């Protein structure tokens, strides 16, 4: 996203709140949100600051050594040559300001957007300002998708929905000759390449007890051969190349055989019910004009699974935001690992992916949801029944 757009949207957000500005800081890659905002710049070796006031022009504070690295941004730039001139200039920038936002989360509550070190926090506070978390500014200014970004996600989502079905058919076609988990993962990655999609660190293809590990990664050494009677979980994610392309991320489950065992069906039904309860709560909130916070949706899904008797086996958050990274910087649907009070606002996308992981097998169902101005829009194919894999596809 162009820096001018980020600045304009950040100022739009801050003018409606009691915020004097947003102060971004980085040293040697400590704060990736700084670089998400200004764009990639290589070989910056000294501390750098970006001040975005609620009103007025932004200002960079960078080292004399690094000045040419930032020249293309066209932002007013102040240079420092040593520690004293850096702190003096920073004090001047913050003079008369009251409450400012930084990448800080009280008690580390939201690690995803807690990026400044304690010493820097102390330094800025010593200049007479009150520091509040920038999490909501980040979400509003950097995480809402434009039409091009949504289009890229929809393409990835469509291909993911197609390729996961192809993978299940490929397993069926390969049962007689034998196929391992990692070989199914290779098949999926090859299909990504054929469709012009990027290959990252996945997918997860997990059989039976391997599916009890939410992030199982198949390798030639740990993979098992898939056979009749097995339970198969596939979690796959990808996007188009390019800085403006957004991820899709889905998880499906299948059984190799004609009749799904009762226990597997029971757990599957609990997961599907949990997912649908969270989606229904999101849709209801929108119809009623209530903007939900991330933690609230997690509670809805978790309560459903607790009621089904499997609360002890759902030990991760309900979902995460999507963006240029598969786990992005907008709200997570989480009351478990954190307590995410950010709002689920139009323009962002999230996953709904409850899971139950008992020792013998695990079940997770993951869909993607884009929050449009007209309400939640499910962008991926929705699994309703266990896929049955049969020999010969």
Enumerate the predicted regions with their spans:
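Active-site neighborhoods and metal-handling regions in enzymes and metal-associated proteins
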Residues: 1-393
């Amino acid at each position: 996203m162009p820096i001018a757009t980020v600045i304009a949207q950040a100022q739009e957000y801050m003018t409606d709140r009691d915020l004097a500005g947003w102060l971004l800081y980085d040293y040697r890659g400590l704060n990736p949100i700084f670089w998400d905002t200004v764009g990639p710049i290589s070989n910056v070796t000294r501390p750098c600051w970006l001040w975005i006031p609620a009103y007025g022009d932004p200002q960079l504070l960078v080292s004399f050594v690094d000045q040419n690295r930032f020249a293309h941004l066209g932002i007013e730039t102040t240079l420092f040559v040593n520690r004293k001139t850096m702190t003096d200039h920073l004090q001047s920038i913050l003079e008369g300001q009251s409450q400012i936002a930084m990448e800080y989360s009280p008690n580390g509550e939201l690690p995803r957007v807690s990026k400044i070190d304690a010493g820097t926090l102390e330094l800025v506070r010593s200049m007479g300002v009150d520091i509040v978390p920038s999490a909501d500014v980040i979400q509003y200014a950097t995480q809402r998708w434009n039409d091009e970004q949504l289009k890229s996600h929809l393409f990835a989502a469509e291909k993911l929905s197609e390729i996961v079905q192809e993978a299940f058919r490929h397993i069926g076609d390969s049962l007689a000759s034998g196929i391992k988990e990692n070989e199914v993962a290779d098949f999926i990655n090859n299909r990504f390449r054929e469709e012009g999609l990027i290959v990252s660190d996945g997918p997860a293809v997990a059989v039976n007890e391997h599916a009890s590990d939410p992030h199982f990664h198949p390798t030639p050494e740990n993979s098992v051969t898939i056979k009749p009677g097995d339970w198969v979980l596939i979690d796959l994610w990808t996007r188009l190349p390019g800085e403006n392309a957004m991820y899709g991320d889905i998880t499906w489950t299948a059984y190799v055989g004609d009749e799904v065992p009762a226990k597997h069906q029971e757990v599957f039904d609990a997961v599907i019910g949990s997912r649908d309860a969270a989606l229904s709560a999101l849709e209801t909130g929108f119809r009623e004009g209530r903007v939900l916070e991330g933690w609230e949706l997690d509670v809805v899904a978790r309560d459903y699974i607790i009621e089904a008797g499997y609360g002890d086996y759902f030990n991760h958050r309900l979902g995460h935001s999507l963006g240029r990274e598969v786990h992005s910087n907008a709200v997570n649907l989480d009351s478990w690992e954190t307590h995410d009070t950010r709002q689920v606002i139009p323009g962002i996308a999230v996953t709904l992916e409850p899971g139950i992981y008992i020792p013998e097998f695990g079940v997770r169902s993951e869909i993607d949801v884009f929050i449009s101005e007209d309400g939640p829009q499910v962008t991926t194919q929705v699994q309703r029944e266990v896929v049955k894999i049969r020999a010969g596809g």
